[in-house]
Structures are given as structure tokens and as C-alpha cells.
Amino acid sequence: MPVITLPDGSQRHYDHAVSPMDVALDIGPGLAKACIAGRVNGELVDACDLIENDTQLSIITAKDEEGLEIIRHSCAHLLGHAIKQLWPHTKMAIGPVIDNGFYYDVDLDRTLTQEDVEALEKRMHELAEKNYDVIKKKVSWHEARETFANRGESYKVSILDENIAHDDKPGLYFHEEYVDMCRGPHVPNMRFCHHFKLMKTAGAYWRGDSNNKMLQRIYGTAWADKKALNAYLQRLEEAAKRDHRKIGKQLDLYHMQEEAPGMVFWHNDGWTIFRELEVFVRSKLKEYQYQEVKGPFMMDRVLWEKTGHWDNYKDAMFTTSSENREYCIKPMNCPGHVQIFNQGLKSYRDLPLRMAEFGSCHRNEPSGSLHGLMRVRGFTQDDAHIFCTEEQIRDEVNGCIRLVYDMYSTFGFEKIVVKLSTRPEKRIGSDEMWDRAEADLAVALEENNIPFEYQLGEGAFYGPKIEFTLYDCLDRAWQCGTVQLDFSLPSRLSASYVGEDNERKVPVMIHRAILGSMERFIGILTEEFAGFFPTWLAPVQVVIMNITDSQSDYVNELTQKLSNAGIRVKADLRNEKIGFKIREHTLRRVPYMLVCGDKEVESGKVAVRTRRGKELGSMDVNEVIEKLQQEIRSRSLKQLEE
């Protein structure tokens, strides 16, 4: 009979099989009431599942991350329960958990309106408030198939036929008259599923295949309590205000149009930000001793066949033909950099060789996945490739890590999650080589005092990698930086150097990206700063305004003076009230507004105001220039007097 060992090391002995709920009740009624599921020897199980052998057991509650995920999964079933009551002929497809919520794909003979979604959410609340028990049954494959066939659930039958072995025992979860199929676990009672909201609907092909029927996908969010739900909805509201597409239009940064899906038309102000970002990155490339190169926009398909990209990536590549040759528009820069490395004989003395490029790349992303600057088809990568010896890996990775944190800190990103992906089952190279490579990456992170977690088996077949995910002011995750070791591509493209022993050797290649793509990073920054770009990045840094026509010459004189000092400045001499001008430029998020009236002309000064409405008073023009230059030069995130 089972001996149950709890997380604190204490043990409980039973003379019969028990469930996690039984153990929770044995510990106390409060824990039993909070029990959602159990973790048995590291595996999540339902609260009702019986434990027959000695076991390590943790009780899962709504306070646990796993508990919240279970609540969300059960809310997907609740959605299914409600939709079948409202529209009984609906066919249910899949309803998984996603970040912050869940969705369900359904086959319904009507297009859901906003009123339908509201009615569906209302019915979900009515059902959840009944606090009914969720009943789990493990059945044979044949019984499960018969159950769903009798109910006309053709998608569930398809899942059983194509994805579940005949000797398996699927789990059926009964929500009163509604039944769903899942691996589980799920909540034991619907009292855990009171705090949710349906968010939106979208189209989704069955099994993600455009040859299949288009289903309707209903998205929802769910949380453990009302406070967490409201906080999330408030974050979404704030995110909507910060949406880079909305701000991009408001600030006239860029646009996109039907004739070039996923391609950016940069306007003057947006392109100014782009170029300033390039200047910043170039300054860091120089500091960290990189070469900057430029590869061709497209190359013969033969080269992409050699690299393996054609076999694995051709659906995402744009192609064109000329003179009976097929060319691929590059989706990435690395093969071109190997071609540059291969020009001329290289010695171990030439290594490490650090090669960077602002490469214009294109990928044929599905049209439905395109999203402003965040997901595009044409983009500029800020990546680089380092060619080095195995002995140099650790030092080079160290340099990459320092560069990543150096650049991210400039923008105020402080929360960065780091993951180290290790060898997959299918890989090239010896275990000894992988041992050393993984150790080099881990030691480099440790030497920089960077906490990280392993992603076992998640590395590429050609080498391990480090991923850097930054979190913005709304605590959203953005995976931007990577440091990837590559033991394959140099060999495929015949890259070599002469070693100390005068023998030809294949260099190790380190793929290094920090911003990811310039376009996406500008989108991230736009939302992070809500359009209030730090002065050094702002398209227009200063606007100088007159109150009446009599100050026009003075404004023009000052505008020229600031421009000569390297400050991006504009004059606003329109015949409008000064309050109107200030409001307009405040909405345009211009960092500084200098107001010139008769008093300023007489004194040779300016009245300084920030976009946040702070009056800095009357200041000498040279003092303003000096302070602005310092703020811009230091790439400060703060304005004067902040």
C-alpha cells in the first residue's frame, strides 16, 4: 500500500489506494478545497486519479503556475459546454491552453458576431456558477470513438483515428451533458472557473492546413481570481494604447499597404529612428571590433541547396528566375558571410573574425500571421557571424553576452530571461564536441553572473544556443537575442583556415543576433516608450515656436544654430495660438519645445518646456544646446530635470 512523500519530506501511510484529493483532505479541509490536481513523481494527474504505489506528491492549487494552466484548459471545456447548449449542431475541434488563456476551434454554420460572443460568455458564467463537478472517465479507444461518433463530433473522431493509438485509454471529461476528450488534468469542480473573459474570434484552418476547412477560433482569457483578471484586462487596455501600429500612424512613422503585404514603407520620421538605431548598433560594432560587410540580395538556388536551406526552408523563400537560373532572395545572411570568409586563404592568426551586416532579408510568412512591424516579410537583420577556433568559443560567447546586455541596457530593458538549448537526439558531431560546446556556453553565462535555465534537447542539430528574452514595461516577453554555435554550415560551404600545425581546419561559426530585426525592434521600442522615444532616438528633438510674427527671425536664427550643433530641430512659425502649437507638438511626442516671445528675443534666451508638460523656465540658448548635446550623446533615457 502507498507511502506518500510530501514536498516538506513528511510521509503519510495508507492501506489502500488514494487520490491527490484524498491526501489533501487528510491534510486539512482548506487544502482539499483548494486542490485542483496533483503532481505524482513529477507528472501532473487529476485530483481524482488513484495512487497505488509509493509516491512523491505535490498538491496543485490555483496559486501554482500549473494550477492556472489547468483552470484555463477547463475554461476551454466550459466554452465547449456553453456553445453546444446555444448551438447544438456545432462540431468541436481542439481547445488548447495558450499564453494568458485558451481558445477553441469550432465548426459552426453561422459566423459568430460580437453579440454571439457576449451571449456565449454569459452562458459560460451561468454554467460555471452552478459549481458542478467535472467527472473523469478513462475509456477504451473504441468506446471513445463510439461516444463522439454518436454525437456527430467528426473532428474528435479524426483525432482518435489519426493521433491516438488503439490500445490507449483516452480521458473523457463530463461537464453535465457535455463531454470532451483530453489528456488532462482538469479542475474537479467548476468553482475554479469563474474568472474569465472571451476576447475575440478569428479564422483557423483545421490542423493548420489551408487545404482543410476554415473553422472559427474563439479566444478567451482565464485567471485564478477577479483581481488577476482585471489586472490583465488593464494591461491589455494599456497595450492597446501603446500599439505600435496606432502610434506609427499618429506619429507618421511608416505605413503598409495591400500592394506590398508585410513590407514597410518608412516615412521620414520613422526612417530617422531606423537610421539612429543603425548608428547606435554601428558604434557598438566598432567598440566590440566587428567588420561590417554587405552581401547580395539574392543568390543562386544551388548555394541554398548546399546549405540545406532549400530542403528545409524553401516554402518560406521568395524565388525569381533569369537566364535559365533560379535565384533565391535571401531569408538570412549567414551563407553570404561564409562566401566572404572563403575569399582568400585564412590562417589561425586571422581568427576570430567577426562579421556583421544590416542584411535586407525576406521571408514568405503566411499573410494571416503578418502584424505591423512585429511580423513582416521584408526586414533588416542586425546579425553577425563570428568565425573562430574551438578554443576561442568561450571568449567569443563572453563578448557576445556582454554586447547583448550593453545594448539592451541602453533602452532600459532590465528583465531578461536566458535559456541554454542543448543537444537534440539528431545531431552532427561527437559527444565530446557537444560536451565542450555546451560547457563553453554555460561557463560564459556563469562568468557574467547571468542566471539561466536549460532547454534540454532544444538545440539545433548543428550546435547549442543561448536565447535572450527581454520583458517590456507590460511584462510581455520578446525573444530577440541569440548566440548559436554552428558546426555544420562552414563545412557544407567548404570554409577552412590553416591551423598552427599547417593543416586545414574547419572554423566554428557563431551566429549572433541582438535586436533580431530592426523593424521588429522599432515596433517593440514604440510600444515600450508609448511613442515617447528618448531624445537621442526621437525623429524631431526640438521644436522652436514663435508667439507672434515679430519673433520669426529669432526663431529661424535659433533653428539654424541648433541644427549646426547636430540637433534635429524644426521651426513652427504658423499663425496659430501658442497653446495650439504646444498641444500639437506634445501629441507628436517632441521631447522639447522652445517658446520665443518678445521677452526671449530681448534677453537672447528661450522658454523651455518638455513634452510631459514640465516648464523648465527661461534658459540661455548655449546652455540649452550644451545640455541637449550631453543628453543625446549619452543616449540618456531621461530628459532634462528628470
UniProtKB/Swiss-Prot annotation:
SMART domains: tRNA_SAD (SM00863). It catalyses: tRNA(Thr) + L-threonine + ATP = L-threonyl-tRNA(Thr) + AMP + diphosphate + H(+). Its cofactor is Zn(2+). The keyword tRNA-binding applies. Keywords: Acetylation, Aminoacyl-tRNA synthetase, ATP-binding, Cytoplasm, Ligase, Metal-binding, Nucleotide-binding, Protein biosynthesis, RNA-binding, tRNA-binding, Zinc. SUPFAM superfamilies: Class II aaRS ABD-related (SSF52954), Class II aaRS and biotin synthetases (SSF55681), TGS-like (SSF81271), ThrRS/AlaRS common domain (SSF55186). The keyword Ligase applies. One of its GO terms (molecular function) is ATP binding. GO terms for biological process: threonyl-tRNA aminoacylation. Binds 1 zinc ion per subunit. InterPro entries: aa-tRNA-synt_IIb, aa-tRNA-synth_II, aa-tRNA-synth_II/BPL/LPL, Anticodon-bd, Anticodon-bd_dom_sf, Beta-grasp_dom_sf, TGS, TGS-like. Its EC number is 6.1.1.3. One of its GO terms (cellular component) is cytosol. It is found in: Cytoplasm. The modification N6-acetyllysine is found at K286. Zn(2+) binds at C334, H385, H511. Belongs to the class-II aminoacyl-tRNA synthetase family. HAMAP family: Thr_tRNA_synth. This is Threonine--tRNA ligase.
